[in-house]
Regions:
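Long, charged/polar, low-complexity intrinsically disordered N-terminal extensions
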Residues: 55-67, 75, 92
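Short amphipathic alpha-helical patches
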Residues: 24-28, 38-43, 233-244, 429-433
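Short amphipathic recognition helices of helix-turn-helix/homeodomain-type DNA-binding modules
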Residues: 3-56
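Non-catalytic regulatory/interaction regions at protein termini and inter-domain linkers
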Residues: 429-444
Length: 444
């Protein structure tokens, strides 16, 4: 119809938006659209803006503690300059700590935190913010809570000790223009309270005032809920996924594994693990047993018609080229052999009679290290790699975010996925090309 009406690209987009909104409602449509955009644009391998800090310039204003009275700031430039100084003053310390009560859509503060977190892994950031308590759109036709997650994920990946906690409120009312100073930044020697439009701020330096504000912030922080559970070691990751799989089995809910690369860890054999796990790895034998047990549970109890596994053509190619799976750090094991790579892909395809395999019909190449999602209706986690190729597992704790991912995967349109015949044809073509390429290289 859009083609018949000879609509411009912008008119076609608006027309299709209106059509889908009529079908499913505005909140559901924009929530699903927000999840899709998050997945398509996600990458924690590329830093945001490059900030070059000159200590002499940053130190122009004296913000050390012990002063009397307050310092007012007027205008966005002066407020942002004060924020930069506070962040910089803590980030250069060996054990700096920044406590912030700001919304994730404050791009200036979030980008600074990411940059300083990358520069100083010992930096601790406590972040308290408000999640929207309803499905109404706040701005730009986006789901507000998912937009918050999108802003936060790069800081999760920057390497510092980042602790994000949330509370619920009506965001529109919470940050309206009649709130005096809804935002707060706390450091060792200073506290900066500022307005939602970043036009006005007050700097506090008196120790008695700072002590009271720290106690209040810590009290609020403890009352709030953690946005995610971060798992930084192989052992904690294995323990978490094992628990999650047990919960998946116990639940009647459908389960979804959405990955760029096929979910192959459940197909690894004990022989493969014995051959490729690094010999010097601490707890090596325990890890072999744990991964083998995980594979056994996956094959005997998880891979059934309640399980849907999404993967991409690009992910198949990546696995064949590298011999590595997404779920484990590359320093823990050597790449799988040529024959093992072929065998794993064929074993994966053979699962189509037991589980639902869905190859994504990609219109554009996804990020090299994209967002992996494993969810059912009750719990789940996100998995991604940082710029330094460190694996980050984030257990999803916030219900509306969990529901958004689950609903998106449950409702993926047929036109976004290849048919089974197309899937088999494309994968076989990839395997044939891989074998042919390997044969050519071997004959050189």
């Amino acid at each position: 119809m859009a083609q018949f009406m000879q609509l411009t690209p912008r008119e076609k987009t608006d027309f299709m938006d209106a059509f889908y909104i009529t079908q499913m409602g505005e909140e559901v449509y924009y929530r699903r659209k927000s999840v899709g955009e998050l997945i398509e644009t996600f990458s924690c391998r590329e830093g945001k803006k490059e900030y070059i800090f000159h200590e002499a310039e940053i130190a122009k204003l004296e913000l050390n503690g012990g002063g009397s009275g307050e310092i007012p700031f007027r205008g966005t430039v002066h407020v942002r300059h004060a924020i930069l100084q506070l962040f910089f003053g803590e980030a250069v310390k060996e054990d700096g700590k920044i406590s912030v009560l700001v919304q994730p859509d404050f791009d200036f503060a979030m980008e600074l935190l990411q940059v300083f977190g990358e520069q100083n892994p010992n930096l601790t950031i406590q972040h308290l913010f408000c999640m929207n308590n309803n499905e109404k759109m706040v701005s730009m036709r986006k789901n507000y809570n998912l937009s918050c997650l999108q802003k936060i994920l790069p800081i999760c990946a920057c390497g510092c000790d980042y602790r994000a906690r949330y509370y619920y409120d009506n965001v529109t009312a919470r940050l309206n223009e009649f709130r005096l100073f809804p935002y707060l930044i706390l450091t060792e020697h200073c506290a900066l309270a500022f307005s939602a439009d970043y036009q006005n701020a007050l700097l506090f330096r008196e120790e008695t005032t700072l002590r009271m504000m720290r106690e209040m912030f810590e009290g609020y922080f403890k009352q709030s809920e953690p946005l995610f559970e971060r798992l930084d070691t192989v052992q904690s990751q294995l323990g978490y996924t094992e628990t999650l799989i047990r919960h998946f089995i116990a639940s009647d809910s459908p389960r979804y594994f959405f990955q760029r690369m096929p979910c192959l860890s459940g197909l690894l054999t004990a022989e493969m693990l014995e051959r490729h796990l690094v010999k010097e790895m601490p707890g090596r034998e325990q890890m072999i047993r744990a991964v083998a047990q995980y594979a056994k549970v996956m094959q005997t109890q998880v891979l059934d018609k309640k399980t849907t596994m999404f993967f991409s053509e690009d992910g198949i190619k990546s696995f064949l080229e590298t011999g590595r799976v997404d779920e484990y750090p590359k320093e823990c094991y050597s790449p799988l052999d040529f024959d093992e790579r072929i065998a794993l892909i064929r074993r994966f395809l053979a699962l189509r009679d037991r589980a639902n395999l869905r190859m994504i019909r990609e219109t554009k190449e996804r990020a090299e290290h994209a967002l992996n999602i494993s969810v059912n209706a009750n719990e789940g986690y996100l998995l991604f790699q940082t710029r330094t190729e460190r694996l980050i597992y984030l257990g999803i704790r916030e219900p509306s975010v969990l529901m958004a991912f689950y609903d998106y995967l449950e409702s993926m349109k047929p036109e976004e996925l290849c048919t089974e015949e197309e899937m088999l044809e494309r994968v076989e073509a990839i395997l044939h090309e891989f074998v042919a390429c390997h044969s050519r290289e071997g004959s050189i």
